[in-house]
C-alpha cells in the first residue's frame, strides 16, 4: 500500500502476520497512491485448488467502482485481457446501468448527505415494469435488507402521499398510496456508511442498526420533498 511517499508491506499465513515493513521504495511502482492485494489459496484448506468465478468477481468490482466514484480498479485474471473498471458518476451510473434497455418513467432522484460520521447516498428511478430492484450496501458490503431500507420506504411513502394530498392528486375520500404500490417499477441504489454497523440474519446481511432508519428517513424525506416540488411531471408519473 502506498501513501505519503511510503510503501507499507504486510504478509500473512494461516491467519498470522509474517512480515510488516514500511519503506521509501516507491520507484518500482507505477502509481503514487493505492493498494495491491494478492493471495494464494491455502492448500491445507483448498486441497483441490480453486477456480475463481471471473464473471462474479468482475461484477463485484464493478459494484465497488459505482460505490467509490473516481477510484480505478484494474482486473487481470489468467489469460483474460486486463480490464480497467472505473465510474466517474458513482451510483448515478449504477442506476443507468440497472435501467438499461428499460423504458424509464422519471428522471433520477439523487441525494447525498453526511451527518455525524454517517453517510447516505441514494439514487432512484422508476421504469414501466412491475419489478422492483433494490441494491443496498452498508460500508460497501451488499445487504438483502435492513433498517436503512425501512427508513427509505417510510420516507418515500410519506413524501409521496403528502405531495399528492397537497396538490389535490389524492382527494379527501381517497386512500393513501401504499408502500406496495410504490414498489412497482422502482429501481433503488442505497449506500449507507456508518462506524460499527450491526447486522442480523442467517448470513449477517441485514442491517439492524436502529439509527440507520431514523437518519435515512429524515434525510430522504427532506430532499425528496424538494425534488417532487421541482419535478412535477416526475411526481405525477
Predicted feature descriptions by range:
Residues 1-97:
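GHKL-type ATPase core
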Residues 3, 10-29, 52-60, 135-154, ...:
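Extended active-site and interfacial segments that coordinate phosphate-rich ligands
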Residues 7, 22, 36-37, 108, ...:
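Extended aliphatic helical segments
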Residues 43-52, 170, 200, 226-230:
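Short, polar/flexible loop-turn hinges at active-site or ligand-entry regions and domain interfaces
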Residues 178-237:
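Extended, well-ordered alpha-helical scaffold/bundle regions in very large, multi-domain proteins
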Amino acid at each position: 500500500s502506498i501513501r505519503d511517499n511510503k510503501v507499507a508491506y504486510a504478509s500473512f499465513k494461516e491467519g498470522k502476520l509474517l512480515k510488516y515493513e514500511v519503506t521509501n521504495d516507491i520507484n518500482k511502482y507505477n502509481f503514487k497512491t493505492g493498494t495491491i492485494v494478492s493471495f494464494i489459496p491455502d492448500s491445507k484448506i483448498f486441497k483441490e485448488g480453486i477456480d475463481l468465478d471471473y464473471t462474479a468477481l468482475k461484477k463485484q468490482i464493478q459494484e465497488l467502482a459505482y460505490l467509490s466514484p473516481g477510484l480505478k480498479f484494474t482486473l487481470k485474471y489468467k489469460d483474460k485481457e486486463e480490464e480497467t473498471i472505473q465510474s466517474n458518476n458513482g451510483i448515478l451510473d449504477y442506476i443507468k446501468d440497472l435501467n438499461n434497455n428499460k423504458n424509464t418513467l422519471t428522471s433520477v432522484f439523487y441525494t447525498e448527505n453526511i451527518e455525524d460520521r454517517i453517510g447516505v447516498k441514494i439514487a432512484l428511478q422508476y421504469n414501466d415494469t412491475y419489478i422492483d430492484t433494490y441494491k443496498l450496501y452498508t460500508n460497501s458490503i451488499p445487504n438483502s435488507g435492513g433498517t436503512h431500507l425501512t427508513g427509505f420506504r417510510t420516507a418515500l411513502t410519506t413524501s409521496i402521499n403528502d405531495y399528492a394530498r397537497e396538490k389535490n392528486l389524492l382527494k379527501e375520500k381517497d386512500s393513501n398510496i401504499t408502500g406496495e404500490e410504490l414498489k412497482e417499477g422502482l429501481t433503488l441504489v442505497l449506500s449507507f456508511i456508518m462506524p460499527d454497523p450491526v447486522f442480523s440474519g442467517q448470513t449477517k446481511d441485514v442491517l439492524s442498526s436502529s439509527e440507520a432508519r431514523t437518519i435515512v428517513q429524515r434525510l430522504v424525506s427532506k430532499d425528496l420533498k424538494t425534488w417532487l416540488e421541482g419535478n412535477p411531471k416526475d411526481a405525477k408519473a
